[in-house]
UniProtKB/Swiss-Prot annotation:
It comes from the Bacteria. Pfam families: NA37. GO terms for molecular function: double-stranded DNA binding; single-stranded RNA binding. Keywords: Cytoplasm. InterPro entries: Nucleoid_associated_NdpA. The keyword Iron does not apply. GO terms for cellular component: bacterial nucleoid; cytoplasm. This is Nucleoid-associated protein SO_2177. The keyword Endoplasmic reticulum does not apply. Its main location: cytoplasm.
Amino acid sequence: MSINIEQAIIHEISQDSQGQLRCRLRPQPLLNGQAVEMMLEELHQTYTSKSGKGFGYFGIHGDDGEANPAFANALKEYRAGDLGFVEFTGQASKLLQEELAKYDFSQGGFLLMSCYTSMASDYLFVALLSAKSSMTVLDDMELSQNNHLDLNNIQLAARIDLTELQADKDSRKYISFIRGRAGRKVADFFLDFMGCVEGVNTKAQNKTLMNAVEDFVASSDLTKEERQQCRNKVFEYCSERFDEGADIEIKDLADELADQGMESFYDFARGGSYELDEEFPADKSTLRQLKKFSGTGGGVTISFDGGHLGQRVIYDPISDTILIKGVPANLKDQLDRRLKGE
């Protein structure tokens, strides 16, 4: 296993016959058996691999809008040993119930909370899971419908880096959370119940890094091939950091580039007007533009590796055209068939 589970528990928030939300609290933690280990391992992998996560911190009531300090205070008591895990998670469930009650769309769900260790960091994982209906075949070959937790489609989840929280009280990124689809913050209520305030604009930082890299290679004496190697190296480094759940460190990245013969990136990035933080989380979807060009519009979708620009792919901005040399075999086959049919 890539994680070491300390404790885990599930509480249920559901609607009663009058449509009121109620908490059904589990009286003891889940036993750390195979089922729990497999579930949390899967959730850990799924959550870690999700790109586009947001990052924040516990807001201070009054200074950061209407941030609710109740969750942070309960967590502090739990970490200090003044509150048991069951009591802490029970309080959290009731806080979530109160927040959900403000919205008409909520149906509740199963609140999973778990403390575990991964890569020498302690985490508190918080997720509101939903049940999904499925069919199974019984021993007598009859079909039966049952419900199971939908672990592959988690949309309401957050993870608190307890190690970073303890080491750096001024950090603004020790809480990560899943953003809503298409950039919509559909999970605002989930962050509100924890009193989480967004602290780092991850996409903006990654976009700025990408711009700094492009400006760096443009101002250098590198050949075209060396420039693409630089972009590829940046993407490779950032991808590794993303997969490890670690931050991009500008100094560390500059050292990686220096090892490849590309000196002075750190001074270039810090000396300009880029306003890059020394450390920030990686966003693969943004940085992928270092390796690929892609775009969609008017019923046309184009995607190709950056190294092909100027060789197999010729762009003429004056005529607003793209020429592709060596059409992919499967596309060529489709086009030839269509021409013959016409």
